[in-house]
Amino acid sequence: MSGLREAALVAVRDLMGATPGETLLVVMDGGTRNVGYALYQAAAELGCEAMAIEMIERTNHGEEPPAPVAAIMKHVDIVLAPTSKSISHTTARAEACAAGARCATLPGITEDCMARTLGADYAAVGARSRRYADVLTRGATVRITNGEGTDITMSLVGRQGSADSGVYHNPGDFGNLPAGEA
C-alpha cells in the first residue's frame, strides 16, 4: 500500500470519522490534485458518497472559493480541502461548519508531507496540543526567541488557548491536517 493511499485512508476513516453513506466533498486545485484524488479514492473505498471539485488556485490565503463550491460545502457531511492556498478562514468554510459539516483544510499539503505526517499517533498529538493550549490559557506572557534574532514578547491575558487535535468526528468540527497546533 502506498504512503499517500494509506495517509488518505487515515485522514478519511480515522481523523474525519467517515462512515459508509456519508457525503464527502474534496475541494482541491491543480497544485494539490494528487492529494485530492487520493482522499477522494479513500472516501469512495470506505463507502462514502464521494465528490471531488477542482477549482482554479486562489491568489491569496483566505480567498473565498467560487460560490458554487461554497454552496455544495454547506450540503455535505465532510469537507476535505487540500488546496494550495488556505480556505480555513473563509466564510464558505465557516458556513459549512455552521451547517454541520466536519471540515479539515490541508493548505499547501504535498504528497510527501501527507504520507509522512498523517500516520502520526493522533491520540498523542491531541494530548500534547491540549496540554500546550492549557499552558497558553493559564499564561500571562509569552516570549519567543531564536538564534536569528527574533525576540517577541506578548500578553496572553484574556486569551484562550485552542487545541487542534486532528480528530474531527462531530458536526461542525474544524481544523487543519496535519494537526497539533495550540
Please provide the spans of the model-predicted regions.
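Active-site bordering "gate/hinge" segments
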Residues: M1-A182
